């Protein structure tokens, strides 16, 4: 109930879970070992899932189970961009990046997994 959900937590969760669902027959270890070209997500799919998860997080906030940072009130496009910029900002390599064609990619599935974990215990998987 004192967990604060940041935009960086949300975008990491969304990206990792989209990839995980795509490879649902794989173990987490196998997913973490996927080649980079298998770990991309389209901006359109990302935004759809982002909104779905954000809506569910708002319900959890109303139920006093979590606290949402003010970033989560931003319009979808801005929330996505802010979250992507912030996730893993203390690391020398990007965790998530969006290219000019709207493809979201990661350089490190392990870091993405690490940052996604903050939201992994809230039963959000069914909304992916």
What are these regions (language model features)?
Residues 1-128:
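Membrane-interfacial terminal anchoring regions of lipid-handling membrane enzymes
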